[in-house]
Amino acid sequence: MKKIILMLTAVLSLGMASLGFASPASDLLAQEETTTSNVIKLIQGKGQLAEVSTGFSPALQKNFNAAALDNMKKGVTEQLGGISNLKLVRLDKFADADRLVYIGDAKKAPNVQMTFVFSVKGKKAELQGLNLIPVEVKQVQNNQKAQA
């Protein structure tokens, strides 16, 4: 009897967990991650601005032109030496905006943090802005010892 109850609990837990994967927020996150990965590739010299800018807000489409992209690439190359291995480490959700924070490796700095801010209108997410800053990521050690 205990095994049946345990099995039933496990099945229901997995079923409830899968509901989160089908939420509308996951569609927005997929859009945002697609845009961020395309922007990252663009900064690394891969892709075309015209294709990537479809996920931008109208203001960013106007201001982030080829000259601004070249300036950003130059700044990344000079200050960071290039970026790689970016991983999403934080997602902040607000009423009408999302902020995605990525941490990755840089050649001339210990690490780089990229922050992307999206405005959310219904089921559409538009990139409002982004920034890159060099950061130092410190590993936190767990000093707790097992107590007998």
Feature map (PLM): residue ranges:
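Short solvent-exposed beta->alpha transition segments
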Residues: 50-95
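Positively charged n-region of N-terminal signal peptides that target proteins for export
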Residues: 1-5
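Short helix-adjacent coil turns
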Residues: 43-51
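Bacterial N-terminal signal peptides
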Residues: 8-17
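Short, low-complexity N-terminal intrinsically disordered segments enriched in polar/charged residues
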Residues: 18-42
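Exposed beta-sheet edge and beta->alpha loop/turn motif
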Residues: 93-148
